[in-house]
Amino acid sequence: MGQTKLNYLYRKNQDLFGSFLNESSVKLGHQDYFGAIEAVTKAINLNNKYPIPFIRRAEIRYKIKDYKNANDDLSEAFKFKKNCPENYLFRAYFLAYSINKNLENSKDAIINLEKAINLRNTSKAKIWPIEIYYLYEKKGDFLRESGKYDNAIFEYSKAILSGINNPLAKTRLHYKRGWLNYYEINYAYAINDFSIAIKKGKQIDKYHYFMARGFSFIKINNLEKAIEDFKNALECNQLAIEFYKDFFLNFVPKETCDLVVIYFGVNLEKWS
């Protein structure tokens, strides 16, 4: 076969490869997920040594909760990661974290999340689909759910110090870290976190922050400030104390609960 014909066949193959990927994107845009998978599979059948189609198929399969096959696709993609653009490799690592979390494979989930964080931190790229604070927050969430509160606090702190420009996200992080500081008996730090959340948070959510700080004040025997915070919480939401009834009953001394009941006129029957 002559070189000219070989070049022609190569170009034709590449054109088909690109057209199948485009077809997949169009079908995905119309939420035809199975049609999109079929199209990208045709591209893979033409060239199964290129990582991007595997990543794209994994993303589609993730949308339809086909986690096992999505994970298999990423395993294939990672075989060719040396030829993978950083933005796609980052997407693949974060997707692998999400998939393995859904598969309850905690070890692989955290490994891939750390790879995404490391790539994000070492790359010279300026534009990323996910802010670094969000990655630290997800790692903190993961560690919190695993009961590793000290490590989770460390990750939330990195998120807060990462130059985050989203005030609502920053408030959320202080609130999360505040509760972990509470459970780790770091009450002064918890009070500071909740105070920041009160200052920066949306009005509709502030009753949560006031209640949390009030519980922290109870732990350092400052009932006067605790009562003041509970009062502020009620001004934000008249059902604030009722919302935290179980917390009062399980984590607050009975004499303090009785004081709150008397001071705020809570229905005693609901607390029995």
Segments and roles (model prediction):
Residues 1-272:
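Alpha-helical tetratricopeptide repeat
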